[in-house]
């Protein structure tokens, strides 16, 4: 007779969850940040709001963003004028777009990740899909399963409406799935499309304008599994430890509400201040067991909610400017892509580490941290171990 303990042991993987491949995708439409205020105020018929446009121009100038990618083109917006008003009923039009585009963009990223992984897609056992862009049944996880031709008994997990911290959440869930299911190969997809949040400007809702200055579209996909197959699967990062916490006294700091007018975005408190005030505690909890207290000795992947968050974290921890280079580069080239951002930064870091001849995927360092920040205010922490190049 086999004991429950023996069954349990046989079900578990031996090694830590490992990122085995990364793929990214963006819509074809590239938007230059320098000229975006002119386009935005013209397409929303708001050119008469000159003071507001000047404020928006300053927001864009200070954003540290050079370009973004957006599904919404001038043609699409002209065909859907309700999206260009501030609070016009427009959810049907938005849903019609994102229900199709979110899985489609996710597929594009997933195909790249599967190709790099080098294994047949029939070996995918689990799928985690995350988006803050629209809600539907069956969900984007189901649609992606069909688009990719995955097996019908792939175990699916759909995460809707989590916001900007969710790039950390999907890694936390993927780690648990990979380590607790021997032989599991988890396809993780984050796909975000701003068609759900785009709206015209308002004098009375400046935090909405912040979102219009920062958000971009993108999808990222990973393959995660434990015990990589030698010579076939090539590890990129190992996931060692994860945590999620709600920052104290932060209720209402970041809110998003799905209404007839789409997803409205609200910043009600000093978000950079809340993050920087709580970052030290999160780092101590994560790295004290590793006897690491010098945070310049680790590599950094932080969700770039905006430049002010990165600036305050750097200042609080006395980080060297190069620590946030990969994070700032992704913010500059793509804007804030919500949950997909940290996965883009993982990809950027491993590529640049190889190009620069460094000895590990983590900028030549062994240990690193990935942070997600978002509604709640919720902080996701993932401790990563790099792999020798």
From Swiss-Prot:
<dbReference type="InterPro" id="IPR001099">
    <property type="entry name" value="Chalcone/stilbene_synt_N"/>
</dbReference>
<protein>
    <recommendedName>
        <fullName>Chalcone synthase 6</fullName>
        <ecNumber>2.3.1.74</ecNumber>
    </recommendedName>
</protein>
<dbReference type="Pfam" id="PF02797">
    <property type="entry name" value="Chal_sti_synt_C"/>
</dbReference>
<dbReference type="GO" id="GO:0030639">
    <property type="term" value="P:polyketide biosynthetic process"/>
</dbReference>
<comment type="similarity">
    <text>Belongs to the thiolase-like superfamily. Chalcone/stilbene synthases family.</text>
</comment>
<dbReference type="InterPro" id="IPR011141">
    <property type="entry name" value="Polyketide_synthase_type-III"/>
</dbReference>
<comment type="pathway">
    <text>Secondary metabolite biosynthesis; flavonoid biosynthesis.</text>
</comment>
<dbReference type="InterPro" id="IPR018088">
    <property type="entry name" value="Chalcone/stilbene_synthase_AS"/>
</dbReference>
<dbReference type="Pfam" id="PF00195">
    <property type="entry name" value="Chal_sti_synt_N"/>
</dbReference>
<dbReference type="InterPro" id="IPR016039">
    <property type="entry name" value="Thiolase-like"/>
</dbReference>
<dbReference type="GO" id="GO:0009813">
    <property type="term" value="P:flavonoid biosynthetic process"/>
</dbReference>
<comment type="function">
    <text>The primary product of this enzyme is 4,2',4',6'-tetrahydroxychalcone (also termed naringenin-chalcone or chalcone) which can under specific conditions spontaneously isomerize into naringenin.</text>
</comment>
<feature type="active site">
    <location>
        <position position="164"/>
    </location>
</feature>
<dbReference type="GO" id="GO:0016210">
    <property type="term" value="F:naringenin-chalcone synthase activity"/>
</dbReference>
<keyword id="KW-0284">Flavonoid biosynthesis</keyword>
<keyword id="KW-0808">Transferase</keyword>
<dbReference type="InterPro" id="IPR012328">
    <property type="entry name" value="Chalcone/stilbene_synt_C"/>
</dbReference>
<keyword id="KW-0012">Acyltransferase</keyword>
